[in-house]
Amino acid sequence: MIRVDEATVVLGIESSCDETAAAVVMGGNDVLSSVVTTQIEQHARFGGVVPEIASRAHVEAMTPVIRKALQDSGIGFERIDAVAATVGPGLVGALLVGVSAAKSIALALNKPFIGVNHLEAHLYAALLDDPNVEFPMLVVLVSGGNTLLVNMESHGNYSIIGQTIDDAAGEAFDKVARFLGLGHPGGPAIDREAKLGNAQAIEFPRAMLHDGFDVSFSGLKTAVVNYVRKNPAISTQDVAASFQTAVVDVLVAKSVKAAKHIGAKTIALGGGVAANSLLRQEMTATCTQQGWRLVLPSMAMCTDNAAMIASAGWYRLLQDGPSESSMGAMPNLKLTDRTTS
């Protein structure tokens, strides 16, 4: 059994969607290097990620990205103690590229392989800069594929207390941006347009605002489409600002309710939507008002990256040991599914 401590170095690999990434992390939180190659331009003209294109791009980028991560870290393969890779959820073809690379390196070096849950890794993204947190902690995971309110009771111990019943927050951003002709990815595009608009111009609905901990954004998306079709001369910037405010209002309200329910004094954000400027601003103000601690990932750690994969892998190795060598891609993996022995 490998000894896991602050000197343990993990090579992390990420390829779940449209970013090819590799990183070297020591002790779970000390990021020695983090390299990300994005495929945004390759998918932009299609208005979304094309799985076949993504897989081929990962194959082309994987070796150079890993080589660059090692070079930037200043260490060689001989110093790597374990290799971690995203096994799911994600696009199956894309996942297989990263998993195959990681398992091959682990086998060649005779080092442990750790299959990492991509959702769990997003929980650790905020902790890379601020690892000393108090549990229980509420993690608000908001991305293109998921919107989850997670009670993080300790490292590796989670329960989902709220989630979307239809569209994820990031998915709603993408769909509204596409409808408004703002391009892909939608989150940053909406954020940019919203800064130039009036957030009070349109009163869009806040679905399920007072009901439980689950969220719903499908109705909001439909409301935006219907409003614009009835008012074609409306400012796109006002629509973006009003839509974004509606999403953030729901996320903040649900987060406060969930944090009080579990007795958390710390809230952490994770996922691509955690980069949204209004969400960060409003969550900061709310936590200050409540006397809570807010843990925010750096902007670079909001989007998919391998540093969070290596970090989550380190914690999994510490708690549960390595994954089975037979583990493959698990495209439908849930947050609470195990990836280690």
Model-derived features: positions:
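A short helix-loop
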Residues: 2-8, 15-16, 23, 33, ...
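Short glycine-rich phosphate-binding loop at a beta-alpha junction
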Residues: 76-87, 262-273, 295-298
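N-terminal beta-alpha supersecondary unit
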Residues: 7-79, 85-89, 118, 122
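Glycine-rich phosphate-binding loop and adjoining helix at the ATP-binding site
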Residues: 49, 79-125, 130
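A contiguous, well-structured pocket-lining segment that forms one wall/lid of small-molecule binding clefts
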Residues: 192-267, 277-290, 317-320, 337-341
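Short beta-strand segments
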Residues: 12-13, 84-86, 117, 138-143, ...
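Conserved phosphate-binding/catalytic loops in two-lobed NTP-binding clefts
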Residues: 115, 283-309, 323
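Conserved phosphate-binding catalytic cores of ATP/NTP-utilizing and phosphoryl-transfer enzymes
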Residues: 1-8, 116-138, 312
